[in-house]
Structures are given as C-alpha cells and as structure tokens.
Amino acid sequence: MASGHGTYLQVGAFANPDAAELLRSKLSGMVSAPVFISSIVRNQQTLHRVRLGPIASAGEVQQAQNSVRLANLGQPSVVTSDQ
C-alpha cells in the first residue's frame, strides 16, 4: 500500500478483491504512477479501493484521468492519502 501525502486517483472500489486486482493489473500497464489497492471496512463490508499515485502535478493528474477514461476503465476521482 502507498503511504505519505499527495494526490491520488481512485478508479474503483470493489467488494470482490479479484475485481480490484484485475483493474489494478490493467491500470499498471497503462499509467506511470504506482497503482495499488487500499482496503477499508465500511458498514461492516470490506471495500478494495483501486488507486494510483501519488501524482506530483495537476497536469499529470489530468493526463492519468484521461488515460483511464479513454480505456473505458472508469471515471477516476481525485482523493488525498487520508481519504
């Protein structure tokens, strides 16, 4: 799991860890930022969040968002490391 402060993109959140891993694998081959899964428990259910980052600049954030959208892999949301 990534640590530290910065800007991240959350591409998806899944109850099924296999679905999260599949998306992580697809993203790893197409973006330069690190891709990782961050698991949390919400409402007694584990969610596996697929994120990329940290991303250093606003331009890189925009480029990564566009790459994900063009590949039809979701609508990434900008998040910070503590969300």
Predicted region positions:
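Extracytoplasmic
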Residues: 15-83
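Conserved short N-terminal element of RNA/RNP-binding modules in eukaryotic RBPs
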Residues: 9-13
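Long, low-complexity, acidic/serine-threonine-proline-glutamine-glycine-rich intrinsically disordered tracts
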Residues: 1-7
